[in-house]
Design a protein with these regions (language model features):
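N-terminal secretory signal peptides that target proteins for export/translocation
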Residues: 1-10
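Sec-dependent signal peptide hydrophobic core
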Residues: 12-20
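Short, flexible coil/linker elements and helix-boundary hinge sites characteristic
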Residues: 15, 24-25, 260-262
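C-terminal segment of classical bacterial N-terminal signal peptides
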Residues: 19-30
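Flexible loop/hinge segments at secondary-structure junctions
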Residues: 32-299
Length: 299
């Protein structure tokens, strides 16, 4: 089916209803006061906290707790059976699903944008082209006044300062979405880094933060820093976000409207696993997040 919400707010609202339907057998099996435990991606953590509040309205004795520990952590705990549900911004692989004896249901719960955040005092509305962005995170462009960056930012006083990339320390679905985009638009990046939840970054002097919040905090206090976080974390921390060039050649800043345009052409296959490598409209670095639920409960 097509991903045709008019805004990400509608996506969130509809996904609450969708998850409630999928989780209904789990809730029905709860016969007494109980706690359901989830863990995984930090990307959807605020949304899943909202789910918990909605669930509590109709299931008074049920407490739902979600720990933000990264997508790799979410998949790992779900496969081990140490949680009741998991969260990941990278859909589980067939090999991972095969390890779950209780069966797996993947529910795409929301979509969102990955912002490229930076810390350059005096520089606003930074533009990063499809040629430049992959080379920064592949370690090929190392100075802010590189001619290739200056070309897209005429009249901007870019400093002769080393670029300090900030990446995730943990296995991350946000990293998966980001590297999937860079691998799609750059053959060099694909060969050098590739698409991964936890790649081996070939960047000298890169700093690492745990979770979206950790990356946001590091960029905020690192002059010359650049990183990638979920759009909501960029807004929450009031960090400047670059305008990123999409496939149509437009430089677009992340926003709910721009992310929705980027997601508007998504078509879901039967297994709901779909990845947006390079959106032609709106903001180009977008992706989905999934909730992982067991087909068979233990109750």
């Amino acid at each position: 089916m097509n991903f045709k919400a008019t805004s990400l707010n509608r996506i969130v609202t509809s996904s609450v209803a969708a998850v409630a339907v999928v989780l209904s057998p789990v809730f029905a099996a709860v016969a007494q006061a109980e706690t359901l435990v989830g863990a995984g991606a930090s990307f959807p953590a605020p949304l899943y906290q909202r789910y918990a509040r909605e669930v509590r309205k109709t299931h008074k004795n049920l407490q739902v707790n979600y720990t933000s520990c990264g997508s790799s952590c979410g998949i790992r705990n779900f496969v081990k059976g140490t949680v009741d549900f998991g969260g990941s911004d990278a859909a589980m692989k067939d090999s991972e699903i095969a390890k779950v004896s209780r069966g797996t249901i993947l529910v795409p719960t929301a979509g969102g944008a990955v912002s490229v955040v930076y810390n350059l005092p005096g520089v606003s509305n930074l533009k990063l082209s499809r040629q430049v962005l992959p080379l920064i995170f592949a370690g090929r462009i190392t100075k802010w006044n590189d001619a290739r960056i200056r070309r897209d930012n005429p009249g901007v006083n870019l400093p002769n300062r080393r670029i300090t990339p900030v990446v995730r320390a943990d296995g991350s679905g946000t990293t998966f979405i980001f590297t999937n985009h860079l691998s799609t638009i750059s053959g060099y990046f694909k060969g050098r880094v590739g698409t991964s939840k936890k790649p081996r970054w070939p960047i000298r002097g890169a700093r690492k933060g745990k979770g979206n919040s950790g990356v946001a905090a590091l960029v905020k206090r690192t002059s010359g820093g650049i990183g990638y976080v979920n759009y909501s974390y960029a807004r929450l921390n009031r960090i400047k976000s670059a305008r990123v060039q999409n496939r149509s050649g437009q430089f677009v800043a992340p926003s709910l409207k721009a992310a929705n345009l980027g997601l508007s052409s998504v078509k879901f296959p039967a297994n709901y696993r779909v990845f947006v490598g390079d959106a032609s409209r709106g903001y180009p670095i977008v992706g989905l997040t999934w909730m992982m639920i067991y087909k068979k409960t233990l109750h």
